[in-house]
Amino acid sequence: MGIMMMVNWGLEARKWQLLVRPLEYVPFKRAFMAVFSGVSVSVSTPNRVGEYGGRVLYLANRHKLKAIAATIVGSYSQLIVTIVMGLCGMIFYINNFEIIKSSQYFAPNFWEKILLGVLIMICVLIILLYFRLQIIVAIFDKVPILRKAKIFVLIIARYSAKDLRKLLLLSTLRYMVFSAQYLILLYALGVTVVWWQGFLMISTIYLVMAIVPTIAIAELGLRGQVSLYFLGLLSKNMAGIIAATVGLWLINLVLPAVIGCILLLGVKIFKDK
């Protein structure tokens, strides 16, 4: 599990290394340190937005604000993968589980299907925007209140379609790694599920967690409830589901955050010197 955690965040470090390359060269080791530091800062901020601030500490001062925009592109690519995979999970969920009973007015899972349709439209729009990031720069140029900040977002228009596809590939690989971690923990703790069904339900869990705003340090409770709801449809081993969820949270978030805190202390000492 520790090795998979390192692979998970190593892929994220590679993404960030590619993203900031137009600004300055960052060795992979330094990118890895920046990612861990970002995790440590993010645990106390809504939806981990503090992650951006933790990473840019490793860059030159003149590049920090521009690097935030670059880092957001990386999060954007990960969100696309989360939504696409989550939609696959939602389709499986809707087709196999009638949670809201049908009535004379609504067909089975009517509202779930409405939600699925909305999510598909949103997914199509964000993918189109992802490959047309120049639109965001144009918005900053057209809106007076945003015009002064345009210089900080120009970097997102410098990524080629090839760069963006590479980011999506790395995001997909990372998604597969932390989904596999979850499945392995479930099996290790006696939660018996068909692997592909478990993967689809895990994808649905990640989709819900991406949509619902939360703070990382308080995320565990919500993650536990969502996991019990979806994985509980496949297995009655509730204790195993909770244990796997807590284990994944500790391995993929708490441990990197602790490492990041130590690294941030080193950055501060270096600056003091």
Regions found by a protein language model. Give the residues of each.
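Short amphipathic alpha-helical coupling elements at transmembrane boundaries
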Residues: R21-E24, G54-Y58, A69, I151-R158, ...
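Membrane-embedded alpha-helical segments of transport systems
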Residues: S40-T45, A69-I91, V246-V258
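Transmembrane alpha-helix interface/packing and boundary motifs in multi-pass membrane proteins
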Residues: V41-V43, S203-L222
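Re-entrant/interfacial helical elements at transmembrane boundaries that shape
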Residues: G50-A60, I215-G232
